[in-house]
Amino acid sequence: MLGFNSKKQYDENIKNPPSDDSCPMVSALFSKNNNLGVNALSLAILDLIDRDQIKCDIDLDGSYDVGKKLTSEDMEVMKKITLRIANKGELKTSQTAAINLLKNMNKNKKFNLKAMAKQTNNSSVANKFEKDFDEFIKALKNENGYDGENYKDILESSKLTGKGKEIKKQWKSFQDYLKSKELTEKYPPQSVEENSMQILYGACFGIEKDALSIRQNNSNLTDFIDKDGYKLLNIIFNNALLNVSEKRKGDGIFYGVNDKYTIPGGG
């Protein structure tokens, strides 16, 4: 078991993810009610960028942070972040679903975030997004053997098992490592790939910018996160669900929608 206190002696294993659970599932374990929300889709897209299945072209120098409300400046920044779908080789069903969702939203393999954001104000696009999002979540659950209440030997009837509590503690220690300057300097990532992987896991806990601040910005993924790309994806996808014209009732679906942000302009 990994503890995290001043008396504990650490070795380089502290920098390794404690299990092979996927990023969306790790995020779900730390979320309220263990839900898979829109951030699961955003995390899947980050992973596809990291795997070079989605190319990322950013025409912007320096770091960028989105404020509490989207401004015209934010929209212009989004215009300078272009994604291009370049999927090659075998993909998981959920990865294919995520890519198809992006294609359907944008009617193209290449698009910038501003254009995608404005599309989500169109109710027909939003309705299609909801269906595609449901397909993505369904595929993700199937791949991970998760039915919303039970997951491996970690969750039973929506409650952490003894093993689950142990795993969660280990992930908490890894989370603490990701944002610890002292531990990161002592046990730094040894490659570009490991550096990106650690920052990707940081996104699972919403500390991706903290993790990046003490690591290198040396890949397409880290540059995307440096421009607040993860947060922007969540805002865009939340906006799509807010603009669904026919709200369903009684199906128990929870999206984790945050309505603080609105996308200016029509579809």
What does each model-identified segment do?
Residues 1-267:
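Acidic, Ser/Thr/Pro-rich intrinsically disordered cytosolic tails and loops
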